[in-house]
């Protein structure tokens, strides 16, 4: 027998004692606050790691993930054992409600909150997502004392964490309370929210930590156990196919039941493994030689070596070759699975389902008879292994049992965006936690772009005090804005509503000279009015001088009193002696004193509403470029004011490609986009014309640098552009190809997750958000 395996089996051997209480069934002897558990001379430590997008990755990406996981297995320390666990745990309903449901505030929006909460509860009461998955890696080692064990864990935990992080899997060490919480949720299914544990308080009162997690009763039968009011069964993988698909573990853990699947791994030093395989090969060759000698003695000189001997020789040579030339390691492994049910009948049915999945992969998943207690301890993420049905595998063969499936997005306090199309779990993201909170919502007409944006607005309006500002070129947001108690400002040449293009808040310029920044804005405005590139150097100097003179008294008064207007600016130009000043004044007269002077008068609308919509549908071709600049500058003023109040601002720009058709509004938006995070703001661009959008270098840069994207159904050319820009695989592209409204991909930071979303149509919120003619008629 291999020395490492022999030592491990010897060290793991424990003296059996008959348990006198339910607490005695839990084999933990001692715990420390940092999460180190002791069992005899063995110590263990557990990490929790997140899932990654393996199921929908491209073939090349899957290969890269597989190789990275193989490297993790190869790096396992030969002096320890490792357990990789997938935990299907029941969703903690009370904790879920605290994290995502919106509490009432006693205002006019409580009706909307009630509808929104009902929608969320419908999503999680659906049987397909009442279970959530967690993944753990438990390292265990035999040491003389806890100090030696901690020194070992400091090294190995850091190495495992860094390798998992390299695979984009977030990793965290679990402390004692975290580990006990996992055990509590398993032993006491249905009581997840009742876990309370304080190690110091327990020590002070002389209570055992086992009292906080143990079930009320535990009874072990031949092929199952009864725990509290639940039935459970432990299975193990007895027979392995010659070729196993990498989806088997995912399929086994897709059962919507409380279950844990664990893979115990004992790595073998390469020199021992090579020596063992050389001895095995020598034994096989000896058997072949003896067989041939017997045939020769019978004068049978042309006999062919029997198939079974030839196969033994071939497999042994292949494994020896793997160990010596392909950087493979020898591992001993055992796969155990424990699942729970409400009744014996349900348990038997679930067992048959699991066994049929294994049979589909030509493997045999067998019940542990008379070993249910040992199997349970082995399946839980404790660090113990009491099942000796070990299988010899290479790194590559073991890596096929890969524990990854689909990346999840769940940010505490975030916004609900839909359900993961693979796992059916809710997607909850907080854009403010990203490197920047800027976003784009992209899709063909009818794919649900506006609805996705409105749904986010509704969530923010109901759950936060943040400000929401919308630029609406199609006049479609009025029902929602007014329904949420906001204000819509119609802007056109004939509208009585006016926004002063020269409004300036205190703090404009972010510490820089505000007049300089406003001068740049007015230069852009004048060039937009007169024509790009038509302002001479002298005219620019005159504009800069007049800007400073117009604002002098206003700034000296501490930004109090009447704010200058474009009409004041026009009058100041006329007072200048230079001919260039008169030329500029004449050129902009149409927009200051003429029929298009809607932005040349004092602001006469309330731009302080918490939810504000600028309706620019009727601006007209001549006023649109100027109107875009003025509205963006007005929004910039609002963002500055909100930053002083420590209030977040959310900006939504529908049909954003319109802004990129005009150089100055595009440049102003680009500058604003870069500053959003600094000003506690998040910008969202909405567009269906992606090909046109990406023709602008400015738009392409903004899109590439936005951390959050919602991609709905896309046209063929747009899909190709997005795939190149965002490195989206063909498998992922299938989720934005000829799909129904409300389906697509969400890019959140580095994660790209397929999603599906639907909203109950009978609700008032839906009627406020929908733009479908059939819904509106109804």
Task: Go through the PLM ranges and name each one.
Residues 485-489, 698-711:
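A short helix-turn-beta junction within AAA+ P-loop NTPase domains corresponding to the substrate/partner-engaging
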Residues 449:
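Conserved lysine of the Walker
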Residues 1-404:
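Extended, folded cores of ATP/NTP-driven motor/assembly subunits in large transport
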Residues 52, 59-78, 89, 253, ...:
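P-loop NTPase motor domains
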Residues 459-469:
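Post-Walker A helix-loop "phosphate-sensing" segment adjacent to the P-loop in P-loop NTPases
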């Amino acid at each position: 027998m291999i020395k490492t395996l022999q030592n491990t089996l010897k060290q793991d051997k424990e003296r059996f004692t008959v348990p006198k209480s339910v607490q005695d069934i839990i084999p933990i002897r001692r715990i420390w606050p940092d999460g180190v558990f002791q069992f005899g001379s063995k110590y263990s430590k557990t990490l929790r790691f997140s899932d990654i997008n393996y199921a929908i990755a491209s073939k090349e990406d899957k290969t890269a993930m597989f190789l990275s996981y193989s490297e993790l297995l190869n790096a396992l320390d030969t002096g320890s054992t490792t357990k990789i666990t997938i935990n299907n745990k029941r969703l903690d309903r009370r904790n879920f409600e605290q994290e995502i449901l919106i509490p009432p505030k006693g205002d006019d929006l409580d009706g909307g909150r009630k509808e929104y909460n009902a929608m969320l509860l419908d999503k999680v009461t659906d049987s397909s997502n009442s279970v959530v998955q967690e993944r753990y890696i438990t390292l265990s080692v035999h040491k003389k004392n806890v100090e030696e064990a901690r020194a070992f864990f400091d090294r190995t935990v850091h190495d495992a964490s860094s390798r998992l992080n390299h695979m984009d899997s977030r990793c965290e060490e679990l402390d004692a309370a975290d580990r006990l919480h996992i055990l509590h949720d398993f032993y006491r299914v249905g009581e997840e929210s009742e876990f309370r544990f304080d190690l110091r308080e327990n020590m002070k009162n002389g209570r055992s930590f086992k009292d906080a997690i143990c079930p009320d009763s535990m009874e072990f039968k031949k092929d199952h156990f009864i725990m509290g009011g639940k039935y459970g069964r432990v299975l193990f993988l007895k027979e392995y196919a010659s070729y196993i698909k990498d989806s088997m573990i995912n399929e086994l853990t897709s059962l919507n039941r409380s279950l844990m699947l664990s893979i115990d791994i004992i790595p073998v030093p390469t020199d021992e493994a090579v020596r063992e395989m050389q001895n095995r090969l020598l034994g096989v060759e000896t058997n072949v030689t003896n067989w041939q000698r017997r045939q020769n003695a019978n004068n049978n000189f042309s006999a062919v070596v029997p198939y079974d001997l030839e196969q033994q020789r071939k497999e042994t040579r292949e494994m020896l070759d793997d160990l010596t030339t392909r950087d493979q390691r020898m591992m001993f492994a055992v796969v155990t699975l424990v699942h729970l049910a409400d009744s014996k009948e349900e348990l038997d049915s679930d067992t048959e389902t699991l066994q049929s999945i294994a049979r589909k992969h030509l493997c045999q998943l067998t019940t542990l008879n008379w070993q249910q207690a040992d199997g349970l301890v082995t399946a839980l993420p404790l660090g113990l292994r009491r099942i000796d049905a070990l299988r010899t595998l290479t790194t590559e063969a073991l890596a096929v049992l890969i524990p990854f499936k689909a990346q999840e997005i769940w940010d505490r306090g975030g916004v609900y965006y839909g359900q993961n199309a693979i796992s059916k779990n809710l997607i909850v993201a907080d854009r403010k936690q990203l490197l920047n909170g800027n976003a784009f919502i992209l899709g063909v007409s009818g794919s649900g772009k506006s609805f996705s944006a409105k749904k986010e607005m509704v969530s923010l309006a109901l759950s936060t005090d943040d400000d929401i500002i919308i630029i609406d070129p199609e006049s479609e947001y009025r029902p929602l804005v007014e329904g949420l108690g906001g204000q819509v400002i119609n802007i056109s040449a004939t509208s009585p509503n006016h926004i002063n293009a020269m409004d300036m808040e205190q703090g404009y310029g972010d510490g820089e000279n505000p007049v300089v920044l406003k001068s740049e804005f007015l230069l852009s405005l004048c060039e937009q009015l007169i024509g790009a590139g038509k302002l001479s150097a002298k005219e620019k100097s005159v504009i800069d001088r007049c800007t400073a003179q117009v604002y002098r008294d206003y700034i000296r008064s501490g930004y109090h009193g009447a704010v200058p207007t474009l009409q004041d600016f026009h009058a100041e130009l006329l007072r200048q002696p230079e001919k260039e000043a008169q030329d500029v004044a004449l050129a902009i007269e149409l927009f200051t004193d003429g029929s298009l002077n809607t932005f040349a008068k004092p602001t006469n609308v309330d731009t302080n509403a918490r939810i504000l919509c600028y309706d620019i549908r009727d601006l007209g071709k001549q006023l649109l470029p100027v109107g875009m600049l003025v509205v963006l500058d007005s929004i910039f003023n609002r963002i500055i004011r909100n930053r002083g109040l420590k209030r977040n601002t959310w900006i939504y720009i529908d049909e954003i490609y319109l802004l990129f058709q005009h150089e100055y509004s595009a440049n102003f938006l680009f500058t604003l986009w870069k500053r959003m995070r600094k000003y506690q703001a998040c910008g969202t661009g909405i567009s269906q014309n992606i090909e046109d959008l990406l023709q602008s270098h400015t738009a392409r840069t903004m899109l590439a640098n936005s951390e959050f994207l919602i991609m709905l159904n896309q046209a063929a050319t747009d899909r190709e552009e997005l795939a190149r820009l965002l490195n989206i695989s063909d498998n992922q592209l299938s989720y934005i190809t000829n799909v129904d409204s409300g389906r697509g991909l969400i890019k959140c930071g580095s994660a790209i997750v397929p999603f599906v979303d639907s909203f109950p149509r009978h609700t008032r919120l839906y009627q406020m958000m929908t733009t479908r003619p059939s819904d509106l008629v109804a």
